[in-house]
Amino acid sequence: MAKEIVRKAKLQFPAGQAKPGPALAGVGINMPEFTKAFNDQTRDRGQEPVPVLITVYKDKSFEFKLFTSPTAYKLTQIAKIKKGSSKANKEKVATITLDQLKEIAEYKLPDLNTNNIDSAMRQIAGTAKQMGIEIEGYAEWLKKGTN
C-alpha cells in the first residue's frame, strides 16, 4: 500500500546552502536530515537557486525532487545583468543570441511541459521578452519555422 501524502511544499534554496529555518519548519520534516541530503545533492551547482518539491508522508518521512534553476536566473546569468527591466516593452536591458537561448532551453527541457526544443525556446523567449532581454535573430528564426 502506498504511503499517505500529508503535504507537498515547493521551496527554493541556494545550491548546497539549505539551512533549518522558518521555511522548512512549516513543512514538518526532519530539517537536519533534509538539509544534509539537499546540500549533498546540490553542492556541485555553484550558487544557483534550486527549486525543490518536498513530499511529506503521514509517518513523517519525506522525499524531494530537485528542479532546474529558474529561467529568469539563467537569463540574467547569460545576459550578465543583475535583474530584468521594469519596463520590458520600452526599455531593453540586454541582448542574447539564438545559440544562448537554445542552451537555456536544453538545460530547462526536463522541467518544461514539452519535449520539443523549439517549443522550449519559445517559452524561454517569452520570459526573456518580459525581462527586457532581446534575442538576436529570433524574429527571423520564428519566420523560418522550426529548425
From Swiss-Prot:
What's the name of its gene?
Answer: rplK
Query: Do you know which CDD domains this protein is assigned to?
Result: Ribosomal_L11 (cd00349)
One GO CC annotation, please? cytosolic large ribosomal subunit
Any one Gene Ontology biological process term?
Answer: translation
Protein name per Swiss-Prot or TrEMBL: Large ribosomal subunit protein uL11
What does the record give under GO molecular function? Answer: large ribosomal subunit rRNA binding; structural constituent of ribosome
Keyword vocabulary terms for this entry: Methylation, Ribonucleoprotein, Ribosomal protein, RNA-binding, rRNA-binding
**Family affiliation:** Belongs to the universal ribosomal protein uL11 family.
Task: State the post-translational modifications.
Answer: One or more lysine residues are methylated.
- Describe its partners and assembly state: Part of the ribosomal stalk of the 50S ribosomal subunit. Interacts with L10 and the large rRNA to form the base of the stalk. L10 forms an elongated spine to which L12 dimers bind in a sequential fashion forming a multimeric L10(L12)X complex.
Its biological function?
A: Forms part of the ribosomal stalk which helps the ribosome interact with GTP-bound translation factors.
Which PANTHER family does the record match to this protein?
A: 60S RIBOSOMAL PROTEIN L12, LARGE RIBOSOMAL SUBUNIT PROTEIN UL11M
Keyword set includes Ribonucleoprotein: yes
Top-rank lineage group of the source organism: Bacteria
The UniProt entry, under Pfam families, shows: Ribosomal_L11, Ribosomal_L11_N
